[in-house]
């Protein structure tokens, strides 16, 4: 008789110490097989191989994800998979670091941040977090877990190759500033909200971190992009023409980590038009030396 696939909803019934919470998962990990789980709405979670999956971890939510990343093989055959069909599938990886977590090549998310806990709670309920639903509308998501034993290392951006033509000074008020004054323009107008960490000093540091991670190649054509946030704050970044709109999204989330948890849409400022394909280069999207507006999208329960 075939055994059943463990789902995220089973966690609520088989929490720590439950009758079925350890045996089969431990057996699968001892065999060294990758543990994989497909949740509803096209979501999947895959745990690491072998004993690393059972390593100590202080965060209960991390343990729950690893416990959920379990498929019990039926006797004499492969386990059935609850993967929907008929839609394009996107594979994403949740990286667990010793000092936090990240999604794909995105910025570090602190495990102590309540919004990170909420993000993981969505995963633990078998739901795709709203920010991912917005970023990949109408697509199935294979969500995998990859555990690391070292601290987070920011990856270098890998812009698409290709050539471009330098354009004129379309936004003179932005391009006429020095690099230091441009940084000040992006931070001095910041308004302090309920989060005490949102000081001008911290925001300036976060913006500099975002610029470093962007790894702009100054030997290739460059463009200044001014990003207008929902609170009317402005960020200024120097991009290559071959950078994509996805790189702009990563830049925003690194410069303002709050945006990691807020589903948002990037739009051309004038005429107002949302960008449907974020894999486009800035040159192809016709936003060189331009303004990109950020619009927060409503979340759905």
UniProtKB/Swiss-Prot annotation:
Segments forming a coiled coil: none
One GO CC annotation: perinuclear region of cytoplasm
Localization of this protein: Cytoplasm, Perinuclear region; Nucleus; Cytoplasm; Cytoplasm, Cytoskeleton, Microtubule organizing center, Centrosome
Top-level taxon: Eukaryota
Claim: Iron is one of the keywords in the record: no
One of the GO biological process terms: establishment of mitotic spindle orientation
Covalent S-S links between cysteines: none
Gene Ontology molecular function terms on file: K48-linked polyubiquitin modification-dependent protein binding; protein kinase binding; ubiquitin binding
UBX domain ranges (all copies): 218-295
Broad class of the protein's primary localization: cytoplasm
Listed CDD domains: UBX_UBXN2 (cd01770)
InterPro entries in the record: NSFL1C_SEP_dom_sf, SEP_domain, Ubiquitin-like_domsf, UBX_dom
Mutant lacking the gene: phenotype: RNAi-mediated knockdown does not cause any visible phenotype. Causes 82 percent embryonic lethality. One-cell embryos have defects in pronuclei positioning and spindle orientation during prophase; however the duration of cell division and establishment of embryo polarity are normal. During prophase, increases active air-1 and to a lesser extent zyg-9, plk-1 and spd-2, accumulation at centrosomes, centrosome size and microtubule growth rate. Simultaneous RNAi-mediated knockdown of air-1 restores normal pronuclei positioning and spindle orientation but not embryonic lethality.
Domain SEP: 89-153
Chain segments carrying region Disordered: 1-61, 176-200
Sequence ranges of Low complexity compositional bias: 178-192
Tissue: Expressed in the germline (at protein level). Expressed in spermatocytes but not in mature sperm (at protein level). Ubiquitously expressed. Predominantly expressed in the spermatheca.
Keywords: Cytoplasm, Cytoskeleton, Differentiation, Nucleus, Spermatogenesis
Protein task: Ubiquitin-binding protein which acts as an adapter for ATPase cdc-48.1 and/or cdc-48.2, conferring substrate specificity. Together with ubxn-2 and ubxn-3, plays a role in hermaphrodite spermatogenesis probably by promoting the degradation of sex determination terminal factor tra-1. Probably in association with ATPase cdc-48.1 or/and cdc-48.2, regulates the centrosomal levels of kinase air-1 levels during mitotic progression by promoting air-1 removal from centrosomes in prophase.
Protein family according to the UniProt entry: Belongs to the NSFL1C family.
Subunit description: Interacts with cdc-48.1 (via N-terminus) and cdc-48.2 (via N-terminus). Interacts with kinase air-1.
Name by which UniProt lists this protein: UBX domain-containing protein 2
Source organism (scientific name): Caenorhabditis elegans
Gene field: ubxn-2
């Amino acid at each position: 008789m075939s055994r059943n696939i463990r789902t995220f909803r089973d966690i609520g019934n088989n929490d720590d110490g439950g009758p079925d919470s350890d045996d089969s998962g431990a057996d699968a990990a001892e065999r060294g097989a990758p543990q994989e789980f497909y949740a509803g709405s096209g979501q999947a979670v895959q745990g690491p191989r072998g004993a690393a999956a059972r390593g100590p971890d202080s965060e209960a939510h991390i343990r729950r994800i690893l416990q959920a990343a379990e498929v019990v093989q039926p006797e004499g055959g492969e386990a059935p998979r609850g993967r929907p069909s008929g839609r394009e599938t996107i594979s994403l990886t949740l990286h667990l670091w010793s000092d936090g977590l990240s999604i794909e090549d995105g910025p570090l998310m602190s495990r102590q941040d309540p919004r990170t806990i909420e993000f993981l709670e969505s995963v633990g309920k078998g739901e795709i977090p709203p920010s991912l639903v917005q970023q990949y509308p109408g697509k199935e998501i294979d969500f995998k877990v990859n555990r690391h034993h070292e601290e987070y290392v920011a990856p270098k951006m890998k812009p698409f190759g290709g050539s471009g033509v330098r354009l004129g000074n379309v936004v003179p008020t932005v391009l006429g500033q020095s690099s230091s004054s441009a940084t000040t323009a992006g931070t001095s107008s910041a308004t302090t909200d309920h989060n005490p960490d949102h000081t001008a000093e911290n925001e300036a540091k976060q913006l500099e971190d975002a610029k470093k991670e962007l790894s702009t190649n100054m030997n290739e054509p460059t463009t200044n992009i001014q990003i207008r946030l929902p609170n009317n704050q402005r960020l200024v970044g120097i991009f290559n023409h071959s950078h994509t709109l996805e790189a702009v999204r990563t830049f925003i989330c690194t410069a303002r980590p709050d945006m990691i948890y807020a589903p948002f849409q990037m739009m051309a400022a004038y005429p107002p038009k949302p960008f449907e394909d974020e894999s486009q280069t800035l040159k192809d999207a016709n936003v060189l030396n331009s303004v990109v507006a950020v619009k927060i999208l409503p979340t759905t329960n």
